[in-house]
A protein has these predicted regions:
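Acidic/His-rich, divalent-metal-binding segments that scaffold phosphate/diphosphate chemistry
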Residues: 53-179, 184-198
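Thr-Gly-centered strand-to-loop micro-motif
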Residues: 29, 173, 240
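Conserved beta-strand-loop-short alpha-helix elements that form
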Residues: 229-241
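Histidine/acidic-rich helix-loop-helix segments that form or flank divalent-metal centers
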Residues: 149, 189-192, 196-228
Length: 253
């Protein structure tokens, strides 16, 4: 099994992994044979790529870091703005990753325009927890970090859908609106007694840069909470898997 871009998809290819929407329903089933119509439909919904099975990759098995079931639960929780369910999923992500002794990162998830934010948030949670494991954080802290990673973009759900799904560059005014999402996310979470202050600060500060060029507060260096630094790096790294737009951000992290 191997991952290909949607532009490389050809009729007759066999789908290697099922493709889900944000509700957890299957859009394209495992082992379905691609047709021109199906490929066209995938392009229409903004699918960047997919896994296929062929002779070149018949002996390759792609193991996900977290189960499809857990990924679907995370997406559903975020779609429904079910914070309690999201916290449970964040804890489960930490448990699954803690049990995974062989940390070979496979973060290629098949995303459409409508579910990009949700699947991106899952990947940021995974990358953040892996980073936390690498620097020796204890499990209770990892769970708080996982929650911050999973919820870091929850403020975007207050923004217009056409802004979130815009394919081209944002205008100055649109970018100004987009930058409000970290504050909106914090406002949504700040009164929730089930969410730690560490998690809330991770969400609030995840676009701060060590040189002071970030937002919303323009903090520098050690003024930025550790969770936010980890999430920012995970955020940019995951974006780079799907778009070059994040490359400029990486130089400022």
């Amino acid at each position: 099994m191997r991952y290909i871009s949607i532009d490389s998809a050809q009729p007759g290819m066999i789908v290697g992994k099922s493709i889900y929407n944000e509700q957890g329903s299957i859009l394209v089933n495992y082992r379905v044979k691609l047709t021109e119509r199906l490929i066209s439909r995938m392009r229409d919904i903004g699918l960047a790529g997919l896994y296929i099975e062929d002779e070149l990759s018949s002996d390759i098995t792609v193991e996900d870091l977290i189960s499809d079931e857990l990924g679907v639960k995370a997406t559903k929780a975020l779609t429904k703005l079910d914070i309690d369910a999201a916290l449970k999923v964040a804890s489960d992500i930490t448990e699954e990753l803690s049990l995974n002794g062989d940390i070979n990162v496979n973060l290629i998830s098949m995303r459409t325009n409508s579910d990009y934010t949700y699947k991106h948030s899952v990947n940021v949670a995974v990358l953040s927890v892996l980073t936390g494991i690498g620097i020796g954080l204890k499990k209770s802290i990892l769970k708080e970090l996982s929650a911050a990673g999973l919820l870091h973009d929850i403020g975007k759900l207050n923004l217009p859908l056409d802004l979130l799904e815009k394919a081209g560059p944002l205008s100055e005014e649109e970018y100004k609106t987009m930058k409000t999402h970290s504050e909106l996310g914090y406002e949504r979470l700040k009164e929730n007694i089930n969410i730690s202050s560490k998690t809330k600060m991770g969400v609030y500060m995840h676009h701060e840069n060590v040189n002071g060029s970030g937002y919303p507060l323009g903090l520098r260096g050690d003024q930025i909470y550790m969770f936010a630094k980890i999430i920012h790096i995970a955020d940019v790294y995951d974006c780079l898997l799907y778009t070059s737009d994040a490359a400029d951000d990486l130089t400022r992290v």
